[in-house]
Amino acid sequence: MVIGTYISIITLNVSGLNVPTKRHRLAEWIQKQDPYICGLQETHFRPRDTYRLKVRGWKKIFHANGNQKKAGVAILISDKIDCKIKNVTRDKEGHYIMIKGSI
């Protein structure tokens, strides 16, 4: 293990992201915290709503959502990380998402 090598990961229960001002505040908060990976729970997005979550510097955003406006999770991976995604497994009800890959 190399001393000084680390990865920062944050997670947050957002209790719904259907309000534009809340999404904007969340994007600012994520940029301020500056993690490499961010996990979000309770996004309350439906599959057609996922395009609404955008954070500058974060192009890799993975969602798992149900058909109703409840549950929903997302994993955001910063553009600062050179990662290779091998597999993404999503729960159809939006309770979990698993990403397999390498950094």
What are these model-derived regions, one by one?
Residues M1-I103:
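Short phosphate/oxyanion-binding micro-motifs
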